[in-house]
Regions:
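Amphipathic, interaction-prone secondary-structure segments
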Residues: 4-42
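A Trp-anchored, charged/polar loop motif used as the substrate-binding/catalytic surface
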Residues: 1
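Acidic, proline/glycine-rich low-complexity IDRs
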Residues: 4-9, 39-42, 49, 53-111
Length: 111
């Protein structure tokens, strides 16, 4: 899912945020959002979308709480940044964040 999304990333993406959602029935979704701006002091940068996988989110079925799910996805992304096929594409961005859409964003990478 992630590699397919990164293959299609437009050149005008300045930063990426991974929006997390709690769905029904122990399901959790994540979407990749490419943005036209980045400001580590103002999380509204994640609202300036120029690319999104909203119509094709990654869905995980797991009985867990939101914090554990956020940690799970964060760990996955940090590992991907180290050795993923398109890690270089992610690292070209000025910043990468992750967080639930109704919560705070955490920066996991900054150029």
């Amino acid at each position: 899912w992630l590699e397919n999304a990164l293959k299609k990333l437009p050149s005008d993406v300045e930063a990426i945020n991974f929006n997390l959602y709690e769905d029904n029935g122990d399901k959790w979704s994540v979407e990749l959002v490419g943005t036209s701006t980045f400001d580590e002091n103002n999380s509204d940068w994640a609202c300036n979308e120029v690319y999104t996988t909203r119509d094709n989110p990654y869905v995980l079925t797991k009985k867990s709480d939101w914090k554990a799910i956020e940690n799970l996805f964060t760990t996955f992304l940090l590992n991907y940044l180290e050795r993923g096929k398109y890690a270089h594409t992610l690292k070209e961005c000025r910043g990468i964040g992750i967080g639930f859409v109704d919560g705070d964003l955490s920066l996991i990478y900054k150029k």
